[in-house]
A protein has these predicted regions:
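Glycine-rich phosphate-binding loop and adjacent beta-alpha segment
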Residues: 107, 115-118, 163-220
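Glycine-rich beta-strand-centered segment in the early N-terminal region that forms part
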Residues: 1-36
Length: 220
């Protein structure tokens, strides 16, 4: 048996000895271990808590922490997107994708997003995605090359994995980054270093949130 759940929001009811950064009554949220967020009340380390701003509801905070922090480290730290760049984001209508599309749009980037249905295409567009591709029906490599006039994109964010990872390499411009952060279709296949050289001195990384937020300073 094990506790379940790692993302929640709530109100501090009691503080342990030596806690100075929080007070009883503070609204807080977290998306980290130890597991157990499905409980009604629990003891939790304050170094993993974040105060909730007054204009954000508990429900929104609980739902957005993991996805929002994931979007942040992907587009601001793993590969820092700049205004004017065009990026490819797989699963653009997913939880992380919708947040990332809004953020990337605000940064001045152009987003190409793959989606699984026409309904998801409309949702992605409503959240800032300029170009959508039905990746199960269309050749996303050809479409990305067409949109970028054959140049490719500097970064691909891929949470799909097996079905898209190798093809994503063909969407990159020289020195481009493939950021694999999920595996909804299965694990991405092994990639030979020589293939990266042949396709333009490319980079591949497989980041996780917990390495990016493993200290209090990084979290806040």
């Amino acid at each position: 048996p094990t506790p379940i759940g790692m993302e929640a929001a709530g109100v501090i009811e009691e503080l342990g000895a030596g806690v100075t950064d929080f007070k009883v009554g503070d609204r807080v949220a977290y998306a980290s271990r130890p597991l157990g967020s499905y409980s009604e009340a629990r003891v939790f380390p304050t170094e993993n808590l974040v105060k909730i701003p007054d204009d954000i509801s508990d429900e929104t905070a609980a739902a957005i922490m993991l996805k929002g922090m994931t979007a942040e480290y992907l587009i601001r730290r793993t590969y820092k997107v700049s205004a004017g760049q065009t990026v490819l984001f797989h699963a653009a209508a997913g939880g992380v994708g919708l947040i990332a599309c809004q953020w990337l749009k605000a940064l001045g980037a152009t987003i190409i997003g793959t989606v699984g249905s026409n309904e998801k295409a409309e949702l992605a567009k409503a959240n800032g995605c300029e170009h959508t591709i039905l990746y199960k029906e269309e050749n996303f490599v050809d479409i990305v090359k067409d949109i970028t006039n054959g140049v490719g994109v500097p970064v691909v964010y891929d949470s799909v994995g097996k079905d898209t990872a190798l093809l994503s390499l063909d969407c990159l411009s020289p020195l481009g980054f493939l950021v694999i952060f999920g595996n909804s279709s299965g694990n991405a296949p092994p990639i030979e270093p020589g293939l990266l050289a042949a396709k333009g001195s490319l980079y591949v990384t497989r980041p996780t949130l917990f390495n990016y937020n493993d200290t209090r300073e990084k979290l806040i």
